[in-house]
Swiss-Prot record:
NCBIfam families: rsmG_gidB (TIGR00138). S-adenosyl-L-methionine binds at residues 74, 79, 125-126, 140. Signal peptide: none annotated. Specifically methylates the N7 position of guanine in position 527 of 16S rRNA. Belongs to the methyltransferase superfamily. RNA methyltransferase RsmG family. It catalyses: guanosine(527) in 16S rRNA + S-adenosyl-L-methionine = N(7)-methylguanosine(527) in 16S rRNA + S-adenosyl-L-homocysteine. This is Ribosomal RNA small subunit methyltransferase G. It comes from Shewanella loihica (strain ATCC BAA-1088 / PV-4). The gene is rsmG.
Length: 207
């Protein structure tokens, strides 16, 4: 049932996936549903809704990512980082979260699904100092783009971008970019079977 739905959703989004990638996405949903009962990783309980609200919602950002090295800040159980890593095996993803139970889940997913292009880090974002900066800083965890830029300003390369996955947009929020940052793109995302506004904001540090 879920496999057929995944095929349909990928087709709707004009995405192609190998049989291995499809199985990894489905296995990730199964692990999330199983671990969620004990670890309370997400408020979404139904696997069909997990597929829509977590997997497809994460993948909607995929066509807009530029670069090879990304960090997913406040990733929780690995969202959007793990679905994006599965579908972009040529890119590297660091998954950052401050809660140990979420990191344990991510590492188990990495082990069981043999995902070679993710690494999990347990840290608060302001305390994390990577040896190498990132092409893209991703998050769907922050309430406002201002918060994201304040907490994550030290993470991208000079040529890197911030990617914020958002729902409904506030004109005030978009107009009030912190000093030193420029909003370059607002992408309207279409997620199958999700009748809600979804957007991806791309922000760069001003030169």
């Amino acid at each position: 049932m879920l496999a057929a739905q995944l095929d349909s959703y990928l087709a709707d989004m004009q995405m192609t996936a190998t049989p291995k990638q499809k199985q990894q996405l489905l296995d990730f949903v199964a692990m999330l549903a199983k671990w969620n009962k004990a670890y309370n990783l997400t408020s979404v309980r139904d696997p069909e809704q997990m597929l829509i609200r977590h997997i497809m919602d994460s993948l909607a950002a995929s066509p807009h990512l530029v670069g090879e090295r990304f960090i997913d800040v406040g990733t929780g159980p690995g969202l959007p980082g793990i679905p994006l890593a599965i579908m972009n095996p040529d890119k590297e993803f660091v998954l950052l979260d401050s809660l140990g139970k979420r990191i344990r889940f991510q590492k188990q997913v990495q082990f069981e699904l043999a995902i070679g292009n993710i690494s999990s880090v347990e840290s608060r974002v302001e305390a994390y100092q990577p040896e190498e900066k990132f092409d893209g800083v991703l998050s769907r965890a922050f309430a406002s783009i201002q918060d994201m830029l304040q907490w994550c300003h030290h993470l991208p390369k000079p040529t890197g971008c911030f990617y914020a996955l958002k729902g409904q947009l506030s004109d005030e929020e978009m107009a009030n970019m912190p000093e030193g940052f420029t909003l370059t793109d607002v992408f309207e995302l279409k997620v199958p079977r999700l009748d809600e506004q979804r957007h991806l904001l791309r922000v760069v540090k001003a030169a």
